[in-house]
Amino acid sequence: MNRLPKHYTHLVEANGLSSLVLLDGAMQQSLGTRLAEQPEGAISLFANYPKAARALGPWLMSEARAASLGIDGCARGINWLASECSMADVEAHLLLWMRGQDSASRRWQRLADGRALNALLSVWTVAQRHAFSHPWRAWCYADRNGAGHLLTLAHKFEILTPVSTDLGREQQSALMRATLADALIHELRTLTALHSSLKGCREKRHAAVDAVLAQAMAAGYADMTDLSALTAWALRTGTDAPTRVAELPALQQQLSGSELLDALDGEAGDAEVGS
């Protein structure tokens, strides 16, 4: 695992705080499976689901329980939460922001996934960001490469009235856009040859695809098949895909469907299958 950021450890030590660890079982499947088999010292936030679902869901645990699992730093799907609140209060707060007020809801926000968490922060209202941030002195999440970063929290004013966790229509649309590149990269992960400049760095991969999608959507592309084809082209093309996409004859001609696929075929350079 990667080291915790020094700013996080210094803040915890200077203020005599303890940490809780929030884990995404879908991103850390071996750990999620172990927790589902031996949950002592940890809380499944999917408590009402079958064991298989709990294994893939979010888990909240003490620092000691995390250490017993070998968690001593940052990795994808692992979050360190510094708070003065009790574990029970943290659990309640996380459940509220993951599923809303409806305890029977099957629509969950993946707060333990750093990608999803940052996407949500980008679409929440100011009041929502402040209400979510209230319990945390610090929140350390891992980026797409597993490196630790501190979440930008909002503590400028106190929330005096309840704040809805619901997303409006425009927020939902913005969230879909914010998560689109990750979703398409995931779908194509075993199907697309990867350019050598993108191997070993998921952040570069995401940046290249997201920039290509932004230009394509600005040019009028909205069909998911077309956007998937352009994502595959970006993954084959590499880090210079954002500068090359505007020059593509296929985009200039507004090609779509099979014509776009045929035009993009062979456009990319040195590609290697990889993850």
Each model region followed by its residue ranges:
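A contiguous, surface-oriented mixed alpha/beta subdomain in the mid-to-C-terminal portion of proteins
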Residues: 2-47, 51-63, 83-88, 95-97, ...
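Aromatic-anchored, charged helix-turn/loop surface patch used as a conserved interaction hotspot
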Residues: 77-82
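Short acidic/His/Gly/Ser-rich catalytic and metal-binding motifs that mark active-site loops
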Residues: 70-71
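Short, glycine-/Ser/Thr-/acidic-enriched flexible segments
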Residues: 66
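A surface-exposed, charged beta-strand/loop segment in the N-terminal or early-internal portion
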Residues: 74
